[in-house]
Amino acid sequence: MFRDSPREPTREGVLRAARKIAALLPPTPLLPIEIGGVRVHAKADVLQPIGAFKIRGAWHRLTDLTPDEAKAGVIAVSSGNHAQGVAWAARELGIAAAIVMPADAPKVKLAATRALGAEVVLYDRAGGEDRDAIANALCDERGRVLVHAYADPWVIEGQGSMGIEISAQLGQEPSRIIVCCGGGGLTAGLALACPLSAIHPVEPDGWDDMKLSLERGEIVRVGPNPPKTICDAIQTPSTAPVNFAVLKGRAEPGVSVSDAEVRAAQRFAFDRLHLVVEPGGAAALAAALAGKVPLDPATVITLTGGNTDAEQFAAMLTATA
């Protein structure tokens, strides 16, 4: 399923990625917020140019391509946010990009990826098509580099740049970071960036493969008939060896959240922080609000993406909780 990783991600790589990101983009805000009588902080990566943290890993990976690799172009797999990150970086660097995306991805994400100039190759997620097999075949056919959404050491390091920013803004490493977790790219990156912080991955109910993997000490895939979830951005069947090697024995036990808890978190972020946060980007906040992770004043919650269809978001806000 996953191609062998060419190397392991390192904290030195995270620091190098952070310097590259700092030269390109301003830090996203670290916002104080009170939950259950405790003042914590929320890292608002919803305010990145593409509306999500994925720009970090994409920029670090594409700027490390060799001249021949850059000339050939890249392939990526994504439900939307990594797609936009790769497309944005590719446009800035003049690199061709083709993105394998599920046909049922939010329309706003499909449109934004195409608007950034990337080729979009659709696959049937609901029908069980193997997105990684499609991407690997395209790489072999076109002689391109695969920029995996999470199973890539450069991507992991790039996502970890968020942790370097957080520590600088907070004036210390956080006591704990509550992380929206799909494949584990951001989770692993933050574990490398903040070695003194407890790392709490949060996944949708029924898509909690990281939680199960950490419990059993080996990679576990989502079951054959997982439930539907509104958290499309972190709807991932399994983590990858390169991510799990970082997180095994390092991350705290994972937790999962329901769609109702996620919607409550989206409303909370809109009401208290005046931010539009997509379902997958609100999972960590949902866990905090539901009391599933302990909080203290040095806790940081990641708000990882804000790319959601306007009509669906408006309907969610006005619906009875």
Report each predicted region and the residues it spans.
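PLP-dependent amino-acid enzyme catalytic core
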Residues: M1-A321
